[in-house]
UniProtKB/Swiss-Prot annotation:
InterPro entries: COD_ChbG_bac (IPR022948), Glyco_hydro/deAcase_b/a-brl (IPR011330), YdjC-like (IPR006879). This is Chitooligosaccharide deacetylase ChbG. It comes from Escherichia coli (strain K12). Pathway: Glycan degradation; chitin degradation. GO terms for molecular function: chitin disaccharide deacetylase activity; deacetylase activity; diacetylchitobiose deacetylase activity; metal ion binding. It is found in: Cytoplasm. The gene is chbG. Keywords: Carbohydrate metabolism, Chitin degradation, Cytoplasm, Hydrolase, Magnesium, Metal-binding, Polysaccharide degradation. Its EC number is 3.5.1.105.
Amino acid sequence: MERLLIVNADDFGLSKGQNYGIIEACRNGIVTSTTALVNGQAIDHAVQLSRDEPSLAIGMHFVLTMGKPLTAMPGLTRDGVLGKWIWQLAEEDALPLEEITQELVSQYLRFIELFGRKPTHLDSHHHVHMFPQIFPIVARFAAEQGIALRADRQMAFDLPVNLRTTQGFSSAFYGEEISESLFLQVLDDAGHRGDRSLEVMCHPAFIDNTIRQSAYCFPRLTELDVLTSASLKGAIAQRGYRLGSYRDV
């Protein structure tokens, strides 16, 4: 039985090096999908590059942990900037959910303004949409808009009946031990679970000054090498996977 594999590169719009890496991994590798940060410093560059790559499916990378929000978020920002203190607020059950809802709508409308179409799907920077307080908001919004959502089904959330998502999701292709064998192990693990559709998250990039400031820096370049490996596409096909995007879900 043929299974669907979505290889999604996060962080489109983060920097020019990130953008170029994603485009390279699409043109000469196995990346089929990406998600864009509409408040990223290189989002206009990402939009420009995407016009020459119509096969690349583009979703929205909802941002609540970096940069400036599009709306006033006094309950989540410090000095007007978003940050990782969102985890502390979540633990204290003090998230400003109405502000988050308004920001989600604003980022979605900004995406359409930038790219001229709806995103293929939604996910989020640092997986914040999987917070128990935030997931119902994002899942309901995705279902209402008729777009798909990255969802880790191993987390016990109720999904709206009309929400499109993959059966499996993996963030395991990440870290200091990136290799082709690791990527294929992710596929084999999904096969053993019986997943008929799978999204694998990745972050291929060329290194620039912005990426050098990231805690996750040089592995992005290693990811790019693996994802453009001449042998990987054949190994994927041998395992019964067809490369696709959330358009196919």
